[in-house]
Amino acid sequence: GEKTISCPIMNANGEVLGLIQKNASEESTESYAIGAGYGASLSISALSMNDGSLNKIGIKKALPDTEDQALVFLYMSSEQLDKDSYLILINDFLAQYPNSPEGYIRLANYYLASGDASQYALADENMKKALDVATQKDEAHYQVAKTIYSYMISLEEGQEAYKEWSYEKALELIRKAVQSSAQPIHIQLEGDILFAQGNYADAFEAYNKVNQTSFASAATFYSASKAKQLTEGSNMNEVLALMDSAIVKLSKPYFGEAAPYFYERAELRAQAGKFREAVMDYNTFFEAVSGDVTALFYFQREQAEMQCRMYQQALNDINKAVEMAPEDVDFLVEKGSVHLRVNQLDEAIATFQKAISMNDQYAAAYRMLGYCQALQNKNKEACANFAKAKELGDTVVDQLIEKYCK
């Protein structure tokens, strides 16, 4: 009956065999017991945070039995617990594993994530503690350097850093890690810190070392390409070759995560005068993001298409840009210039007039409108527009005045 539910069943020696359970059927007269061994077999694992039954009972969970499992449990919990519960869990972890540098790094990151400058002293204290207790100093130096670097890149422009936290401090720590074990992941962070400092030549050297290891990936070649591009006196072909290497590392079919690589290479190819190849990369980018692009994308692709005389595609793209951003006068003027280029003078004139109605200080619009009118032998209107362009500071219009208005 009801009164016996959860009562123990024992054998003749007084050993508990199981606990009586309620029958799922109200009518049944049979009872069942859950074996005592079941309770003994219950344990908390790294994935217990996702266990629906354990979450329902609302009782605080113990940490898993090993430090590695407990660290995974901490990681899983960081996504699911509220801030206060997570703090209690980290402190429980440190009570159980007081010599775990990862625990102190977690606590430091917790205080940093609060965004409350008054908590930064606690973050600093925990980073120092991590370095103190670590037996693998290289890993601790890497973790603390990474934490300081992440903090530094999150600062707003002009915002002052906390006490001695700086890129220099992060660099000093990561170089200690690199000195004792030059792991690619350490050298990668060294490159990231140098890049953030604007030391692009040394950042490139670091990324280049990583790219000669099995750790090389699309991301590391991308970083090397950017660092090379920003290094003074760099060769554009070398920059492009590195971006090619990044793209070779991507797996097909290309999805969203591949998109930035193709966008970047499209821009590099356009800068190098390889416009047809640039258009191909813009097209791959477009497919990778399933056509979810901005007006600026259509404008940029149109620029490359114009350079390789793909006029119909260019016209389609600039029309799309204008449709998506009708308030952007630059796009409108570009649309007018495409019409002009393919000798659609009436469409060009209407477009430039619309641009001027939106911004009557746009010198280039007056110049190009005047040029269309000159081509239609309407020199009086043309010269009036050239004069307006000159008045507004246009520097190219003098040649047109010389040709049509003398």
Task: Identify the meaning behind each predicted range.
Residues 2-19:
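Catalytic nucleophile loop of clan PA
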Residues 19-88:
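C-terminal cap/linker of serine protease catalytic domains
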Residues 96, 133, 179-180, 212-213, ...:
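Structural marker of alpha-solenoid helical repeat scaffolds
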Residues 101-102, 137-142, 182-185, 216-219, ...:
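Helix-start (N-cap) detector for alpha-helical repeat units in TPR-like alpha-solenoids
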Residues 106, 143, 189, 223, ...:
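Canonical tetratricopeptide repeat
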Residues 113-116, 150-151, 196, 230-232, ...:
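Register position in tetratricopeptide repeats
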